[in-house]
C-alpha cells in the first residue's frame, strides 16, 4: 500500500514540476574537428543486445532497466576510464521531425538534427571537464551535423559544460 502511495505522490510531483521548470536549448554545427589534449574515445552502443553483452555496462542498465526502451530510437554513448563509467548520455539516431522534452512535456522540431539528451557524469568525476569532453568527442564524430542539447536552466554546471563545448544558446522553453 505504501509503495502505491509513494508512486502516486511521485506522479503528482512530476506533473506539477512540468509547470515550473525552465529548459534551455543549445545548438551546434561543427565543421572542423576540435583538438583535444587528452587521449579519449567515446563508445557507442546501438542496441539492447549489444548493451547486455557488454559486462562493463551491466550494472548501469541493471540500475536503469527502463532505459532499454530507448534503443528503439537512440544510441547510448559513454566515456570510460579503466573500469569506470565516467560520463554517458543518449543520441537520438532515428529520423524524426519532433522531439518531446519530457521534463516540460513539450515538442520541438528536430528535423535534420540529432538530439543529445539525458547526460550524466559519475559523481567521482564531476567538475573535472569530462562532460565537456564527451560533448566535444560527439561533435568530432558528427561533423557537419546539427546537434541539439537541452538542460534545466538552474543546472549551472551543465550549462557551463555545454557552452564550453561550443554549443550556442538557442532559446528557453517552458510548459506554457
What function would you assign to each model-found segment?
Residues 153-173:
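Conserved active-site alpha-helix within GNAT-family acetyltransferase domains
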Residues 72-73, 80-115:
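Conserved acyl-donor/pantetheine-binding loop and adjacent beta-alpha core of acyl/acetyltransferases
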Residues 1-66:
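Acyl-donor-binding surface of acyltransferase catalytic domains
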Residues 142-154:
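Conserved GNAT acetyl-CoA-binding A-motif
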Residues 94-96, 124, 154:
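Short coil/turn motifs at secondary-structure junctions
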Residues 59-82:
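Active-site rim helix/loop that mediates acceptor-substrate recognition in acyltransferases
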Residues 118-141, 160-164:
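Conserved acetyl-CoA-binding loop-helix of GNAT-fold acetyltransferases
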